[in-house]
Amino acid sequence: MKKIALALLLTLIIPAALFAADRSITVGVTPFPHKDIMVIVKDLLKKDGYELKIKEFTDYVTPNTALAEGSLDANFFQHVPYLENTNREKKLDLVWVAKVHIEPLGLYSNKIKKLSELKNGAQIAIPNDATNCSRALRLLEKNGLIKVRAGELVTA
């Protein structure tokens, strides 16, 4: 995780912080792993005389609207297709600065311990936004759980 934090520090936080007269920057994050990574970055920046303010959000819409409205200097929670989709839907003009890491996608169950135990007709919850929904469907297809017709998944 320290390598991810260092990459983020070098590519996102320091350039923005250098332009801040008060040497502080406010970054919007979602809980895990983004907040945990920013806590490490905060300690690294403090050594160089910068203050990192971490604002935690529990949804994936507000960090972009807060950034567009100016209450954040940056945010750290999304992949590029999600950002591009949000820009189109909300008519925003946000740009990405750095690609940092790939989010894991997991299947969780209280009853099923192995993927092979998943029965035909089982229900699986997936994300409800276009880019992450498409990604989830692709991963389910890649693992042989569903079949998707060619050309149906074009958003991610």
Name the predicted role of every residue range.
Residues A68-Q78, A122, L145:
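Alpha-to-beta junction loops
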Residues V39-Y50, R135-A156:
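Ligand-binding cleft/hinge of the Venus flytrap
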Residues M1-A5:
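Positively charged n-region of N-terminal signal peptides that target proteins for export
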Residues I54-T65, E152-A156:
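Short helix-initiation/N-cap motifs at beta->coil->alpha
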Residues A21, V97-K147:
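A conserved helix-loop-strand patch within extracytoplasmic ligand-binding domains
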Residues A7-A16:
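Bacterial N-terminal signal peptides
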Residues N85-V97, K111-I112:
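Ligand-binding "clamshell"
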Residues A21-F32, L52-E56, Q123-I124:
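Short, well-ordered beta-strand elements
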